[in-house]
Amino acid sequence: MTETSIAAQGTVAAIGERDEFSALLQKEFKPRSDHARSEVEKAVRTLAEEALRSASVVSGEAVKTIQSIIAEIDRTLSEQINHILHHEAFQTLEGSWRGLHHLVNNTETDEMLKIRVMNISKKELGKTLKRFKGTAWDQSPVFKKLYEEEFGQLGGQPYGCLVGDYHFDHSPPDVEMLGQIAQVAAASHSPFIAGVSPTTLQMDSWQELSNPRDLTKIFQTPEYASWRSLRESEDSRYIGLAMPRFLSRLPYGAKTNPVEAFDFEEEVEGADHRNYVWSNSAYAMATNINRSFKEYGWVSRIRGIESGGAVEGLPVHSFPTDDGGVDMKCPTEIAISDRREAELAKCGFMPLIHKKNTDFAAFIGAQSLQKPTEYEDPDATANANLAARLPYLFATCRFAHYLKCIVRDKVGSFKERAEMERWLGDWILQYVDGDPANSSETTKAQKPLAAAEVVVEEVEGNPGYYTSKFFLRPHYQLEGLTVSLRLVSKLPSGKGA
């Protein structure tokens, strides 16, 4: 028998086996349409080619044979998808979208609360602002977009808060950009919230945060001169830098985050956070800001565990440890102690603190980047401290938005100085709590002022022009409490009895 005839017989045998196998699959899967029948036949051809290529014998159990091949395909796909998901550029992109999703999904938008998204990278923003340095800063497209088109225009809707999905450090380009952003934010009375990079503290990641003994000493070196100057500027109170990042999603896997398309297990090492997806914590702070505005009409309750600073429902991933136990991945990159949180706030940051063994975190403080100026007068120092905290600044900004709009509407009407002062005084008193010592937390959130006073003065030589000064005293929020415990034989209140 010739080789040609043997090969022909082998081909006929292969075709015969494939037809039998095809019939077996048709019986097993019972396709109900021509398309389904075509897909089964296509799978049979692929399976036959694979079997002949590897010189293996196809099992008589069609389902098991297919499952083994599918498992190999899943393994190959998983390896490729892992490479894609864990690429730094893809992780950054996914973290940004999931952070925005967190903000939108946890915000009740309506005609009074809107979210607008501007697609501009940090590099593009820096280049745009750099072209309009110095006295030309108010000619930049950014200024015109944020100020002139809304706050500076009749019928405009001023932005209450700006959120940048960026991470800044103490490098000269970043410091310069933050200063320019602060100018625009101050002019439009819209605080800017963004993230801070661990390189600001000479770290590769936030997992090194517990290493330094004293964080404040880091900022005393010469390379932080421009950073210190930025913090001492007036406009820096409009900048809020949140840290660290929060976990965006659970790793993909059958037991954590199943994928329907194929059997995919994402490769993550629990102790190493580089393969996880993290989002900018500025989104978490923005969510609290929106929630406070929705519930109370004011951005006053955005910090504290029980007063609006909570970030709930964070993804929780547990993993086996080397010693045979089970540990939980911190959803905020690193657990921050109370002492370190106070240090970070003093440095001008807003740390997100994770509650141990829970899916709960919170912003304890809401300190702006500004370093409050210390004066000889204690009252002046207290005023500077208040102005550097975001809950008080947000209230002041909202009053600024309203005042410009309502005063603009009054231009051209007949108003004397006393009449204007009385009218403005009556308006501001709507937001003053009449009994701050006994009112509830809800009342204080809805009426953010404990006291207010308005002074209107005429501009000499320019009839019809007035200058006004608003003195606003907000409700003070608890910043800390020093506790002293003493063992005594008799209480002090009972000594005089």
Indicate residue ranges for each PLM-predicted region.
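A glycine- and small-residue-enriched flexible loop/hinge signal that marks low-structured segments
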Residues: 2-58, 108, 120, 146-402
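Extended assembly-interface regions of large multimeric machines
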Residues: 48-132
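Structured, hydrophobic secondary-structure cores that serve as assembly/anchoring elements
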Residues: 69-89, 107, 291-307, 311-497
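Core mixed alpha/beta domains of very large multi-subunit molecular machines
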Residues: 97-116, 126-156, 173-183
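Amphipathic alpha-helical scaffolding segments
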Residues: 98-101, 179-187, 422-426, 487-490
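A short acidic, often aromatic-flanked loop/helix-cap motif at beta-alpha or helix-coil junctions
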Residues: 122-126, 201, 462
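Eukaryote-specific, cytoplasm-facing alpha-helical/coiled-coil scaffolding segments in long proteins
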Residues: 123-128, 189-191, 429-431, 494-497
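Short, surface-exposed amphipathic charged segments that create phosphate/polyanion-binding patches used
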Residues: 130-135, 207-212, 470-471
